[in-house]
Amino acid sequence: MTVKICDCEGECCKDSCHCGSTCLPSCSGGEKCKCDHSTGSPQCKSCGEKCKCETTCTCEKSKCNCEKC
């Protein structure tokens, strides 16, 4: 089974995959895809706010600004 990286939208059961997540393509006949978050994705933990995987995150004045990929 090939592991692929999901696009931000549109790949691998839209409602199941997040931008940059690794996707195990088990999506057949309405099944949900099994997606795992990328371990190397930047998280804005120091700001106390979580960003979606593979977003660019900048912290200013304890606020987390996340940009979609």
UniProtKB/Swiss-Prot annotation:
Keywords: Copper, Metal-binding, Metal-thiolate cluster. GO terms for molecular function: copper ion binding. InterPro entries: Crs5 (IPR035715). The keyword Hydrolase does not apply. It holds the Pfam family Metallothi_Euk2. The keyword Calcium does not apply. Coiled coil: none annotated. GO terms for biological process: response to metal ion. Belongs to the metallothionein superfamily. Type 13 family. Critical role in copper (specific) homeostasis and detoxification. May protect by directly chelating and sequestering copper ions. This is Metallothionein-like protein CRS5. It comes from Saccharomyces cerevisiae (strain ATCC 204508 / S288c). The gene is CRS5.
